[in-house]
């Protein structure tokens, strides 16, 4: 034993054997203990070696455990630390000799297995009787460890390294587990051209996230399987290397490098038969480097890449390629760039049509072609931060998922009936305890009603179950059809043309006819409780859920609401018909789809004296659209008086404090692209601030400090100003031309001038202000009644042409609010009381008192 040099796994097996013998009460450790310990290792090499000899390792393990259980038991002080018996020591000696023959520096578990088989023990007999003889085990070594020698204490991590740390894409394609790739022929052809070169045959796919870089490699795998590639790639294996699993669990320095070296040696040993794919290629830069070492994965593969010994396909985004790969010129020159651009909307629709059947089978629903068109068009218009076709595929996937959830959930009609039945059952239990005649009569009626409702419920449940079963049957048939098509393709590749003919001209057409009949039965039922078809409206609902933008068709209620928008806004903003009409027209244009899709929904400059409703109209629009007057982005331009403050809107430039935080305007719009943006008191801002708004007003876009494009096409931009207040319309327009550059004014949809408020209009504003005060008092259940004479008194004293409606708000606060607060604190008015406001002292003041 002094010369026995075990690997880490062998050492672990010896410790496990000792533990087994000790816990079983065996006086010594025998080869059966070692055999059981070796085969119990989850990531050991002995089990794959046995499988290569045609023996089931689980069966051997079970038999070895039976042998251990049959050994004699003893008790005493030495039982805690049993020794290896002669047979076990002979096995170690045989294993050490075999390791020397193989040129191994350490004894690994599969060599110890051969040592056990060579001896004369019950464990050796067990292996030999099952067919795992010493010679058979020895011959099986190359299938697991190749031509590698054991030169480290952890060689098992290097055996079958390619199988452990990669995924065989060609195998997945052969099994039909890869989605079809539509289009991208030019990019795939370019990848094949680069792979066919003699040296530097390493294409790298670069493009924005979500444009289909990984899909191109999967498309190449499908083509290799179909034989639709040049001779230089026919029959090759395309594997996807998983650097994450290679790094995971590498505890000691150099362990990652050992694993990577084993993978590279295995690829090199395949003599060009293996093409390697690394997704997120930039991760190889720095992977495995530790401390002072510069030997990362990128540097390890450079020589192989240059010599053409490693055919590598990479995929990474533009930013990460620039950040990691381009910095290392020696690594960059070994790759050939293949740029993958974003597909057009038409191309994206083609891609969706190719994937449609896969998603129909997975979700068990049908997807209309018009829904695919809507997904491509709506995602292109409204989801600007992501790229086609990924965002369109996600829309279709989520819409189908939403529909499937509705099919699996109980319909609304059944839910409502179940609630009614539960309520009636509770009433029945309560009435059954009463003994008076009225209660008994009511109980009889209730039982009759309950029986009717239960019957209705059972009918509805039966209908729902039948419809659900019909939809599920179609889904199962589609799954079977896909499996048969995959089987047909495999049979064709294997040359089994009899089976191909049987499937393609027999079972597949028969199943297609059954699916067609089943789907037509589902369609015939017009009063169906369930819908199993994804429509453009379903897609639009998902877009609305993602972005908050109402992209779907307008319902009847919304149409009427939009047609009456002036009246709704006019109830809150009095006497400004021109402004209300301009904003209402902009919103209607947007919802009807006739607005320019490349500009904001509307951009307005509101001019007029203070207190006439400029800011109030912006709040009213926000309340109309979002049912909350605070649901808008408000930028107080008085805070942007200095030139440098423009950076606060779009975010600080690189190198400045706050660069990573984004801008106050751009971040807010990025989070809520469908909103009202109010720039209040614009004349107080520095003139340079308006230069950044030029692109927003004209193109509906703005680039923030981090280079991201923010979409303003679904916003309503409102700028308010007091410029020229008090002058005529012409004087106000002249003041605007003096204050703002012509290119800024020219980009606005409209410059709306607010008129001064008349005394008559102030009377209407009194009602609005009183209603707001009443709403604030609702929490204390106070019923506020203001007499007509008190309203007239407020309108008369609150009118000031120079200050608009704001003096009226202050007057209501002083004349009613202050007095009411004192009455509440004194206890003269309590929660739930009525409060009367009337004129007192001959019209000198208002009296606020508890209503009798």
From Swiss-Prot:
Residues 343-548 are annotated as: Linker. Keywords: ATP-binding, Chaperone, Coiled coil, Cytoplasm, Nucleotide-binding, Repeat, Stress response. GO terms for molecular function: ATP binding; ATP hydrolysis activity. GO terms for cellular component: cytoplasm. Residues 6-71 are annotated as: Repeat 1. Residues 393-527 form a coiled coil. ATP 1 binds at residues 207-214. Its main location: cytoplasm. Induction: By heat shock. InterPro entries: AAA+_ATPase, ATPase_AAA_core, Chaperonin_ClpB, Clp_ATPase_C, Clp_N_dom_sf, Clp_R_dom, ClpA/B, ClpA/B_CS1. Residues 757-852 are annotated as: C-terminal. Residues 558-756 are annotated as: NBD2. ATP 2 binds at residues 608-615. Residues 1-147 form the Clp R domain. The Clp repeat (R) domain probably functions as a substrate-discriminating domain, recruiting aggregated proteins to the ClpB hexamer and/or stabilizing bound proteins. The NBD2 domain is responsible for oligomerization, whereas the NBD1 domain stabilizes the hexamer probably in an ATP-dependent manner. The movement of the coiled-coil domain is essential for ClpB ability to rescue proteins from an aggregated state, probably by pulling apart large aggregated proteins, which are bound between the coiled-coils motifs of adjacent ClpB subunits in the functional hexamer. Homohexamer. The oligomerization is ATP-dependent. Belongs to the ClpA/ClpB family. Part of a stress-induced multi-chaperone system, it is involved in the recovery of the cell from heat-induced damage, in cooperation with DnaK, DnaJ and GrpE. Acts before DnaK, in the processing of protein aggregates. Protein binding stimulates the ATPase activity; ATP hydrolysis unfolds the denatured protein aggregates, which probably helps expose new hydrophobic binding sites on the surface of ClpB-bound aggregates, contributing to the solubilization and refolding of denatured protein aggregates by DnaK. Necessary for survival of C.glutamicum at high temperatures. This is Chaperone protein ClpB. It comes from Corynebacterium glutamicum (strain ATCC 13032 / DSM 20300 / JCM 1318 / BCRC 11384 / CCUG 27702 / LMG 3730 / NBRC 12168 / NCIMB 10025 / NRRL B-2784 / 534). The lineage of its organism: Bacteria, Bacillati, Actinomycetota, Actinomycetes, Mycobacteriales.
């Amino acid at each position: 034993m002094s010369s026995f040099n075990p690997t880490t796994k062998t050492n672990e097996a010896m410790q496990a054997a000792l533990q087994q013998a000790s816990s079983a009460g065996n006086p010594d450790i025998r080869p059966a203990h070692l055999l059981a310990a070796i085969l119990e290792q989850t990531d050991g090499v002995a089990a794959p070696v046995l499988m290569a000899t045609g023996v089931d390792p689980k069966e051997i393990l079970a038999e070895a455990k039976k042998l251990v259980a049959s050994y004699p038991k003893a008790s005493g002080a030495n039982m805690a630390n049993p020794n290896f018996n002669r047979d076990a020591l002979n096995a170690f000696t045989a294993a050490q000799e075999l390791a020397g023959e193989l040129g191994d520096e350490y004894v690994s578990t599969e060599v110890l297995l051969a040592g056990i088989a060579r001896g004369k023990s019950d464990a050796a007999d067990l292996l030999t009787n099952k067919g795992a003889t010493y010679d058979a085990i020895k011959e099986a070594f190359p299938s697991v460890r190749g031509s590698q020698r054991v030169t480290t204490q952890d060689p098992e991590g290097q055996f079958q390294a390619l199988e452990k740390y990669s995924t065989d894409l060609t195998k997945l394609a052969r099994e039909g587990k890869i989605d079809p790739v539509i289009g991208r022929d030019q990019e795939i052809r370019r990848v094949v051209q680069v792979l066919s070169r003699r040296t530097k045959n390493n294409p790298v796919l670069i493009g924005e996230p979500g444009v289909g870089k990984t899909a191109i490699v999967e498309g190449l795998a499908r083509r290799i399987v179909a034989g639709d590639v040049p001779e230089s790639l026919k029959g090759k294996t395309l594997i996807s290397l998983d650097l994450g699993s290679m790094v995971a669990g590498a505890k000691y320095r150099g362990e990652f490098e050992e694993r990577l070296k084993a993978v590279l040696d295995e690829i090199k040993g395949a003599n060009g038969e293996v093409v390697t794919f690394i997704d997120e290629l930039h991760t190889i830069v720095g992977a495995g480097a530790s401390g002072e070492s510069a030997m990362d994965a990128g540097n390890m593969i450079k020589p192989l890449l240059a010599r053409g010994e490693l055919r590598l396909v990479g995929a990474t985004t533009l930013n990460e390629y620039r950040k990691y790969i381009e910095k290392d010129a020696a690594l960059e020159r070994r790759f050939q760039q293949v740029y993958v651009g974003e597909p057009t909307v038409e191309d994206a629709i083609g891609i969706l049509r190719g994937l449609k059947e896969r998603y129909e089978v997975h979700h068990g629903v049908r997807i209309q072609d018009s829904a695919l068109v809507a997904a491509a068009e709506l995602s292109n218009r409204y989801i600007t931060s992501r790229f086609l076709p990924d965002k369109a595929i996600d829309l279709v996937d989520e819409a189908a998922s939403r529909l499937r959830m509705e099919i699996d959930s109980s319909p609304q009609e059944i839910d409502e009936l179940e609630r009614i039945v539960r309520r009636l059952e509770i009433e029945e239990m309560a009435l059954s305890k009463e003994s008076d005649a009225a209660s008994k009569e009511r109980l009889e009626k209730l039982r009759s009603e309950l029986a009717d409702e239960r019957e209705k419920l059972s009918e509805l449940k039966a209908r729902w179950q039948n419809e659900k079963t019909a939809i599920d049957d179609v889904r199962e048939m589609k799954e079977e059809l896909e499996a048969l098509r995959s089987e047909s393709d495999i049979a064709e590749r294997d040359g089994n043309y009899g089976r191909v003919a049987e499937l393609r001209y027999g079972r597949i057409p028969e199943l297609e006819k059954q699916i067609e009949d089943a789907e037509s039965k589902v369609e015939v039922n017009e009063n169906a409780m369930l819908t199993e078809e994804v429509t453009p409206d379903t897609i639009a609902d998902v877009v609305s859920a993602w972005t908050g933008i109402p992209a779907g068709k307008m319902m009847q209620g919304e149409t009427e609401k939009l047609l009456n928008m002036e009246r709704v806004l006019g109830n809150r903003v009095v006497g400004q018909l021109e402004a209300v009409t301009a904003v209402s027209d902009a919103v209607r244009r947007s919802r009807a789809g006739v607005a320019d899709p490349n500009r904001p929904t509307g951009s307005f400059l509101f001019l007029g004296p203070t207190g006439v409703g400029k800011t109030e109209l912006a709040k009213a629009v926000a309340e109309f659209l979002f049912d909350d007057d605070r649901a808008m982005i408000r930028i107080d331009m008085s805070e942007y008086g200095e030139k440098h403050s423009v950076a606060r809107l779009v975010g600080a430039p690189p190198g400045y404090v706050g660069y990573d935080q984004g801008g106050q305007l751009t971040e807010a719009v990025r989070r809520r692209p469908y909103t009202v943006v109010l720039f209040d008191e614009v004349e107080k801002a520095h003139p340079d601030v308006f230069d950044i708004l030029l692109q927003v007003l004209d193109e509906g876009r703005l680039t923030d400090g981090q280079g991201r494009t923010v979409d303003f096409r679904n916003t309503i931009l409102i700028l308010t100003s007091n410029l020229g207040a008090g002058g005529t319309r012409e004087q106000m327009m002249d003041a605007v031309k003096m204050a703002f550059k012509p290119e800024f004014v020219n980009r606005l949809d409209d410059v709306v001038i607010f008129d001064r408020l008349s005394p008559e209009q102030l009377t209407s504003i009194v009602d609005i202000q009183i209603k707001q005060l009443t709403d604030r008092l609702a929490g204390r259940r106070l019923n506020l009644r203001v007499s007509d004479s008190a309203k007239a008194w407020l309108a008369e004293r609150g009118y000031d042409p120079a200050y608009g409606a704001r003096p009226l708000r202050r007057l209501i606060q002083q004349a009613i609010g202050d007095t009411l607060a004192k009455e509440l604190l004194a206890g003269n008015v309590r929660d739930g009381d009525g409060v009367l406001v009337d004129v007192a002292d001959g019209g000198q003041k208002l009296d606020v008192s508890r209503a009798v």
